């Protein structure tokens, strides 16, 4: 495969579920789908191609892959999958020089996670904070710029929000780069003091961690109450194109559809980080903070289920077409991102009490959570046979974003599986 065609396929599969179905078929017809891979993309034939029933339905567009039948996976299987992913991502997530990596380690392993140098990840993060003067003349703490392979804090307020998400005490003492002693509360107060409400698309894109943070501190609660309906309306507007789609699932992202255009142009929900799933999680946290009724949240959760069906159908079709192609690895990496973040999002809604798992609607949502765990198993099995996690050093040097996705999205998948476990417990009672 020449470099141009190889590059085209990187874009196509890297933008999985973005209208690539017809493009991959075109490359298949033209004979440009196969070819030798680089050190970072060479792979065996994936083992997790979807079952024939799933790929058939995806190819015909009649439905998305059916949820697994009860009993296909048990809670113990989900825990084993969680632990297996953990074995693969722990080293990368413990990078003592990357606050971003350590924050993802905290997400996956909890507040007592250790950095690669043996200290608590929270302490390793704190030691990279540097002091400066803020616009208001007050002392400000921030992270120095990271590197491509060891990001620092790519999204505003990411680190402090994660500390609170995983249960770090706001009173905990942090020792900074210059030896100063501050508390987690210092970082919270700094964020709440300096952050403005989102008012344009760029600010909305970077807003999830601030919005979630507002729900976790008493001083942020009034703003959370005020922003909850605004944020929910914004989410509804940006997912409307999903509700509007009426075609076959496997055709949802074909060239010419509104979903294809939104994904290609990074607009509406697809303009946000990780497909808008962080934004939806923040919106759910805001809704829970104002004690929103499950009935008011249900329409948006229904859109999420529809989106899962549409994207699953496209992933299944692409997996069928690219089976055995070296760069199919990128498809599985994108699947790890989507299914992991989606399980994390739907599981958060359950955790926050935004749906009742004993009702018929709640049982449907729990079934979707269990199906997402099955999706993650197929994806991880494919990556395991592909050897992606065994080749992390080569991937890191050649395709650093793929490396970061394997680590970061693996951590989000772990939290998604943790949040999905109660849906399995419900069926096993």
Where are these regions (language model features)?
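Preference for long, amphipathic alpha-helical scaffolds in soluble/luminal domains
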Residues: 16-46, 50-429
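N-terminal Sec-pathway targeting helices
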Residues: 1-12
């Amino acid at each position: 495969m020449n470099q141009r065609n190889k590059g085209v396929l990187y874009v196509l599969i890297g933008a999985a579920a973005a209208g690539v179905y017809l493009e991959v078929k075109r490359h298949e017809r033209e004979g440009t789908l196969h070819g030798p891979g680089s050190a970072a993309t060479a792979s065996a034939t994936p083992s997790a191609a979807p079952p024939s029933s799933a790929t058939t339905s995806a190819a015909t567009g009649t439905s998305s892959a059916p949820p697994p039948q009860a009993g296909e996976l048990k809670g113990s299987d989900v825990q084993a999958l969680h632990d297996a992913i953990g074995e693969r991502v722990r080293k990368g997530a413990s990078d003592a020089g990357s606050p971003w990596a350590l924050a993802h380690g905290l997400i996956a392993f909890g507040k007592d996670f250790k950095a690669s140098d043996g200290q608590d990840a929270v302490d390793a993060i704190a030691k990279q904070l540097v002091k400066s003067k803020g616009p208001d003349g007050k002392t400000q703490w921030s992270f120095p710029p990271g590197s491509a392979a060891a990001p620092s804090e790519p999204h505003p307020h990411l680190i402090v929000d994660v500390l609170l998400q995983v249960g770090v005490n706001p009173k905990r003492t942090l020792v900074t780069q210059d030896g100063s002693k501050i508390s987690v509360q210092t970082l919270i107060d700094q964020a709440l003091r300096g952050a403005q409400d989102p008012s344009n698309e760029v600010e909305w894109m970077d807003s999830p961690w601030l919005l979630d943070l507002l729900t976790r501190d008493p001083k942020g609660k009034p703003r959370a109450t005020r922003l909850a309906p605004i944020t929910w309306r914004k989410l509804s507007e940006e997912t409307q194109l999903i509700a509007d789609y009426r075609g076959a699932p496997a055709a949802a992202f074909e060239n010419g559809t509104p979903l294809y255009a939104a994904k290609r142009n990074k607009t509406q929900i697809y303009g946000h980080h990780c497909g808008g799933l962080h934004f939806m999680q923040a919106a759910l946290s805001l809704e829970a903070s104002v004690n929103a009724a499950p009935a008011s949240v249900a329409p948006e959760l229904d859109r999420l289920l529809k989106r899962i069906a549409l994207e699953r159908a496209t992933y299944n079709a692409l997996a069928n077409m690219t089976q055995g192609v070296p760069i199919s690895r990128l498809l599985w990496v994108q699947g790890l991102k989507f299914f992991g973040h989606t399980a994390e999002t739907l599981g958060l809604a359950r955790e926050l009490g935004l749906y009742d798992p004993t009702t018929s609607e709640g049982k449907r949502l729990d079934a979707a959570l269990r199906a997402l765990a099955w999706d993650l198993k197929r994806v991880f099995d494919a990556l395991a046979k592909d050897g992606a996690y065994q080749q992390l050093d080569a991937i890191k040097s050649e395709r650093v974003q793929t490396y970061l996705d394997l680590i970061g999205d693996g951590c989000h998948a772990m939290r998604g599986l943790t949040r999905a476990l109660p849906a399995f417990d419900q069926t096993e009672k």
